[in-house]
Design a protein with these regions (language model features):
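Intrinsically disordered, low-complexity regions enriched in Pro/Ser/Thr/Gly and acidic residues
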Residues: 93-223, 240
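Extracellular/luminal recognition modules and glycoprotein regions
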Residues: 36-130, 147, 168
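Short, low-complexity, Pro/Ser/Thr/Gly-rich segments in the mature regions of secreted, periplasmic
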Residues: 224-240
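Hydrophobic alpha-helical segments
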Residues: 1-61
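Weak global preference for isoleucine
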Residues: 16-17, 60, 69, 90, ...
Length: 240
């Protein structure tokens, strides 16, 4: 083969290799874009579901009636949680408040003690008025108990419709002036801590029953009279 022939042969080989590399890069790029698009769509669906469920959970604590919760994937379940009123570090009132929790695609929305928490960790945020308010020598405390019956977990990968029905009763008590604190057991303590910090309340954390789920303990530095309201929602959870 002549020198010119060898050069032409090498150019032809280089062209073939270049085309092959270009095709491979294109295939990989399309695959990456497809995966990214799929992830984006999945994240968008999870975010949309979480927002819709958060809006629905906001309405449950309004009192009596039925609330329909709909989502295309994920799980809605009841988790055990306790809210405590403490005097001198000792529990004087303990209520099994429980939490209604929705999870999907890494997103989490929780309704606990009248407050909705959307998200996890440092990204979590609260929605609604705080159940503990201090001022003028008094501590106003709301405890909202789901008292749930029916399904304890509903969900799957197909569209789901859940009806949450409540029939609330209310109990009011006043406790004489002393040093009090309120402990709210929660799997998202950061959101509660930030909300109470913004309200100027003192916070600490404590695991009362050793189950690994901490309670955010809220207190005021002086003696106060406590006005306590316990709202028993008597919740029934049903698919459909």
């Amino acid at each position: 083969m002549t020198a010119n022939g060898r050069r032409g042969h090498r150019r032809a080989q280089s062209s073939i290799i270049g085309v092959a590399v270009l095709v491979a890069v294109t295939v990989l790029s399309v695959g990456a874009l497809t995966m990214a698009a799929g992830t984006f769509v999945s994240d968008g669906v999870a975010a949309s579901n979480a927002q819709r469920v958060a809006d629905d959970l906001d309405r449950i604590d309004d009192g009596d009636g039925a609330t329909r919760i709909e989502f295309s994937r994920g799980t809605l379940r009841v988790e055990p949680r306790t809210v405590r009123l403490l005097r001198g570090g000792i529990t004087v009132v303990g209520v099994e408040a429980d939490a209604l929790v929705y999870e999907s695609g890494g997103r989490r929305v929780t309704s606990l003690n009248g407050l909705v928490v959307d998200g996890r960790g440092n990204q979590s945020r609260t929605r609604g008025p705080l159940p503990v308010v201090a001022g003028d020598g008094r501590l106003l405390v709301d405890i909202v108990a789901l008292n749930a019956s029916g399904s304890t977990a509903v969900g799957g990968s197909d569209p789901v419709s859940v009806t949450v029905r409540t029939n609330a009763t209310h109990e009011y008590r006043t406790f004489e002036e002393d040093r009090y604190a309120v402990a709210i057991e929660t799997a998202t303590p950061g959101a509660w801590d930030r909300a109470f910090a913004a309200a100027g309340l003192e916070r600490s954390r404590r695991d009362f029953d050793g189950d690994g789920v901490p309670s955010v303990v809220v207190s005021v530095p002086e003696s106060v009279v406590v006005d306590l309201a316990v709202h028993d929602l008597r919740t029934v959870v049903r698919r459909g």
